[in-house]
A protein has these predicted regions:
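Bacterial N-terminal signal peptides
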Residues: 9-17
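Mature extracellular/passenger domains of Gram-negative fimbrial/pilin and adhesin proteins
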Residues: 2-6, 20-171
């Protein structure tokens, strides 16, 4: 009888230890993610080169003198079903003379900056955004134009170069 009591007591102690383990701290598992609109395909290459041609420095001899606008466009195609809008966010180095709406020339010509605008004359400076609806052919297009503007009326000959990055988000 004494032996049965010891075995029973040992079983109770073991069971108590096991049941204590059953009351350990809980662990929370967080599972996250996003269901997103899939990207469209850039129509053409991922770089758009706009050649403004040869401009005489004398055409930029007055403050805010500008070259004629040069039209171009950026497009995406094959947008997945359910993608209804694409927003382009523009970024680049702002021009010191007009940081809200022109970009700095990183070429060798001095006294100039580069303007970028919608085809409707709305400026597309650093930080600008432009949302375009996806059409029935599952494409979206941003018609734009660019030109050189004289910053100080003392443009010097040289190369013209500006880099503007358009980051696309899909809805």
């Amino acid at each position: 009888m004494n032996r049965i009591f010891h075995i029973s007591l040992a079983c109770l102690l073991l069971a108590g230890g096991i049941s204590g383990a059953a009351y350990a701290d809980p662990v929370t598992i967080n599972i996250t993610g996003n269901v997103i609109a899939a990207p469209c395909v850039v129509d053409g290459t991922s770089s758009i080169n706009v050649d403004l041609g040869d401009i005489p420095a004398s055409d930029l001899a007055a403050v805010d003198a500008a070259t004629p606008w040069k039209a171009f466009s950026m497009s995406v195609k094959n947008c997945p079903a359910g993608t209804t809008k694409v927003t382009a966010s523009f970024s680049g180095t702002p021009a010191p003379d007009a940081p809200d709406y022109r970009y700095i020339n990183t070429g060798t010509a001095t006294g100039i900056s580069i303007a970028l605008a919608k085809d409707t004359d709305t400026n597309l400076g650093n930080g600008a955004t432009w949302a375009v609806n996806v059409d029935s052919s599952r494409s979206a297009t941003w018609p734009m134009r660019t030109r050189i503007v004289a910053s100080n009326g003392k443009a010097t000959p040289g190369t013209v170069k500006a880099v503007v990055v358009a980051t696309l988000t899909y809805q």
